[in-house]
Structures are given as C-alpha cells and as structure tokens.
Amino acid sequence: PVPAQQRLGEEALAAGTESLRQRLADDEPIEALVRDRARMVDVVLRRAWALHAGPRGKDVALIAVGGYGRGELHPCSDIDALILLPKSEVAGDHEGIERFLAFLWDIGLEVGHSVRTIDDCQRESAADVSVATTLIEARLLSGPDYLFQAMRRALAQDSVWSSQAFFEAKVAEQQARHHRHHDTAYNLEPNVKTSPGGLRDIQTIGWVAKRHFGAETFDELVDHGFLTAAELRKLRTAQAFLWKVRFALHVITGRREDRLLFDHQIRLARMF
C-alpha cells in the first residue's frame, strides 16, 4: 500500500494543479497563478523537509533558487532547491536529505537540487555566472536564517562578480542565446522563454538590476531612474502575456513545453 504521507502529498499536488488549471480557464490574473503555483510547492517542500530531514535538518537551510526562488512557477517549470550546509563535515550525513528527495520523487515532484556549503557557493558562483545568477534569486524555505544571510553576504562580494563583470557576462550570454534563435523574434514557432524578446530577456533585466542596484522588484527601477513609469507598464504587460502563453502551453501539453508549435497555436488562441 502507498504510505499515508505519500498519498496525501500526491493528492495535494493533484488538487492544486487542477485548481490552477480551472483558474486559468476562468481567466484569473496570470500573476496570481504563477505565484500561487510557487506557494503550493513551498507548502509541499516545507512539510516534506519537516517530516524527513531528521534532527540535523534544523542546522541546514533549505533554499529555493532560480525562478522558484523568485516565487514564479508555471505548471511544469523547473523546481530548483539548494540544501545549504553549515560546514563540510555535515555533508557526510546525507540520510535525511536522501529521504526528503526520495519522498518528493515518490509524490511526482521533480526537484533539481544541489548540496553545498557557503564556501562551495562562493567558489562555484565565481567560476560560473549561471550559478551566480541562480543564487541571486535565493529564498529561504526552512532552516536557520543566519546561515542564509551569511551566504547572501558571501555572494554579494565584488570578488565573486562585480556589477560590471556580471552585466558583461549576462549580455554575452544573451547575445549567444539570440544567435541560437537566428537573432529574430519573428520565428513562426518561437520559444516564449528563450527566443529574442521572450521571458529570459525580461529576467535578464531583473538579474542585472538586482546585482547593480540591489533591486528586488521592477518598481524599484523607476525609483532609480532606470525605467520610466510608462516603460514599466509596458514591461509588466509583456511579461503577463508571455506568462499566460507559457502557463497555457504547460497545461495543454502536460509537460515543460515552451515552444509555440503550430500544433498548439489554435487551441492556445482560443484561451485568449
């Protein structure tokens, strides 16, 4: 028989997913759906951590990173988590962590995870801008806040990425990505996430702003004189449209599909 906790987890995820599907059909604001999906996963991960991490779990920080760290999830988005250890000696005790991850797998929630110390985070961020970017958007789910704040301070140092170096690396990354899409936003089957003008470009603005200004929201970019109020409204409108397209693609296909393929275009159009 399926263990009771596993069954409850499966049922909670299924009910939450169906609720989001219905709310999309009812044309609820997409911003609420994207954030509520992240909140739903928060509840599941916190509960699973409390159940399975064991007594040493209280000394370890469970942290949402990447898009999940931003509090933005689509139905089949990547869910990425960092398990932050206070010191390397604890790394040998993986039993509670393994139980936690196995439970998530059993209930059908695939979570990409890394297990690191603060020194690991600092070293790997300095070596790879994609790691630095993922950790910029960290959000504490469970565990000691002092450990989480110590990681944030370590990663904020210019020795990891100065604002200028980070900006240049993200521009180079963007140019390479655009080139893979033939430098055009006008493909007949665009990728709403990675094509020029897609969600990744909007996210890049947020990453650079966070590294340079410490800005947590796009609204703060108006305060810094980086955007006008009119530009902010346009940006939010574009983001909401792309979010709805991506959310609907995941619902229609039941998988992480970000390409606006011909097969989906008519059905998707009827949802707008």
What is the predicted function of each stretch?
Residues 1-272:
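A nucleotide- and high-energy phosphate-metabolite-utilizing enzyme signature
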